[in-house]
Amino acid sequence: MGYLDEVWWSRLAQPKMHAWSFQGPLRLRQKKKQKGEKQALACYGVLFDEGTSKQMLLRFVERRPISAVTIAFLEWVLAGLAAEGKRVWVLVWDNASWHISKKVRRWIRAHNRRVKREGGVRILECRLPVQSPWLNPIEPTWLHGKRAIVEPSRKLTAQEVMERVCAHYGCALWEPIPQDVL
């Protein structure tokens, strides 16, 4: 069973955290945005819950999540599952517009028909109820990850954010999915 979701990793906004200080409260400094520098990074993730073991697969996106990028991510995950000898992927995800788009739904139907004829990993899609992200077990892991990679003294580069995120979840850092994949 795999729980899929997307998250934005901000390079500027700090997650809500509590901390003790022997000095007075810290004052925020305004930092100027560099031209062409991304403020946030979009990332797809799947949490595989195999009973006692949990595994995360992450893949960053060059721009933002859209249907074509979702399909590319699904293909990438399916290739890994096929290599492991899996036959069915129970995919649990929310109702984001790029999940329920006609393009993605058509692709999943076509993929499952092709798998029925030729073999491979079938997708058994389970959508969560509308406006209920707390039902997806991957959601709390995003918050823990955001707190784990925080750097209060300086702004991280995009590469540093990606490296820290992957190190926190114990997964490999792959090339970001390009926006023009299909």
Where is each model-derived feature located?
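Extended, low-complexity cationic-aromatic segments
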Residues: M1-W76
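Generic structural signal for small/hydrophobic residues in well-ordered secondary structure
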Residues: D5, C43-L47, D94, N136, ...
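A structural signal for isolated positions on well-ordered beta-strands in alpha/beta enzyme cores
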Residues: A42-Y44, V90-V92, L124-C126
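Short, basic/hydrophobic alpha-helical segments
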Residues: V69-V90
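C-terminal anion-handling pockets and recognition modules
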Residues: V121-R122, Q131, L135-L182
